[in-house]
Amino acid sequence: MSIRPLHDRVVIQRLEEERTSPGGIVIPDTAAEKPMKGKVIAVGHGKTLDNGERRPVEVNVGDQVLFGKYAGTEVKIDGQDYLVMREDDIMAVFEG
């Protein structure tokens, strides 16, 4: 199933972070925080401004992004967990 978010919303799949501390201790799932880094899976067409023009979304499918710890709404699609959030909730795009 494919998904197309509306307006300036973005669908993100969380990227798993390293589960081992610098000292080599494995961190269990119950103690680990949810990652704040993810991959953009789908983007909407953009935000409609007050004058009727549409401002396109600045992130693209495949971008790796940084977002707030409590940003977005968690959804499950075909057994996969995703986040749906507004573009404004994305703080940065990883480059390089």
UniProtKB/Swiss-Prot annotation:
| Cellular localisation | Cytoplasm
Entry's InterPro entries?
Answer: Chaperonin_GroES (IPR020818), Chaperonin_GroES_sf (IPR037124), Chaprnonin_Cpn10_CS (IPR018369), GroES-like_sf (IPR011032)
Q: Record's CDD domains?
A: cpn10 (cd00320)
Q: Under the GO molecular function aspect, what terms does this record hold?
A: ATP binding; metal ion binding; protein folding chaperone; protein-folding chaperone binding; unfolded protein binding
| Main location as per UniProt | cytoplasm
Disulfide links within the chain: none
Q: How does it assemble?
A: Heptamer of 7 subunits arranged in a ring. Interacts with the chaperonin GroEL.
The entry's function note states: Together with the chaperonin GroEL, plays an essential role in assisting protein folding. The GroEL-GroES system forms a nano-cage that allows encapsulation of the non-native substrate proteins and provides a physical environment optimized to promote and accelerate protein folding. GroES binds to the apical surface of the GroEL ring, thereby capping the opening of the GroEL channel.
Protein name stated in the entry: Co-chaperonin GroES
Organism annotation:
Halorhodospira halophila (strain DSM 244 / SL1)
